Amino acid sequence: MATETVELHKLKLAELKQECLARGLETKGIKQDLIHRLQAYLEEHAEEEANEEDVLGDETEEEETKPIELPVKEEEPPEKTVDVAAEKKVVKITSEIPQTERMQKRAERFNVPVSLESKKAARAARFGISSVPTKGLSSDNKPMVNLDKLKERAQRFGLNVSSISRKSEDDEKLKKRKERFGIVTSSAGTGTTEDTEAKKRKRAERFGIA
């Protein structure tokens, strides 16, 4: 405080007035009055600054003694692997296509006629039904297979498919009629040989074979 009073005494009147204005004090009076005002102001504020330093010191001590809380890392739940295994099973089941269904799709792709038995087998394999043919259906399926073979052969050699199918149907009807009336269909008799020769000639004329 002694040094401050010495400094205030060294100041001029104009400088003392500026110091009073800076601190919000009155500038009226002589030099000695201004010095007293400034000294009283400095003493009051010196006590306040000391109190503030004490308070700030207490706060810093509390901050230093307060423990630092580290953030606790939450444990992540394990990933579910059940769904992945189930998806793999589904993919494996769908990839196994029955062989009969493959044959049917291949026949449709290349425009090859599929027999009735293969269609039934594919359908039975798709729906899980036993594909055991009955006695009544076994005899009817044979001419269908032969007819399909004739159609394939006719398409291969560029022949008329409708005429071949009609010829096979006529032969089948004639065969059934002979079986019904007990007519022998062996090639030993002369009548049967003439019939076969006539059929051969008609067939050659129909397809333009010399």
Curated annotation (Swiss-Prot):
Keyword Hydrolase carried by entry: no
One annotated GO molecular function: chromatin binding
Protein name, UniProt field: SAP domain-containing ribonucleoprotein
Annotated SMART domains: SAP
One annotated GO biological process: negative regulation of transcription by RNA polymerase II
Subcellular localization, as worded in the UniProt entry: Nucleus; Nucleus speckle
Phosphoserine: modified positions: 163
Organism encoding this protein: Homo sapiens
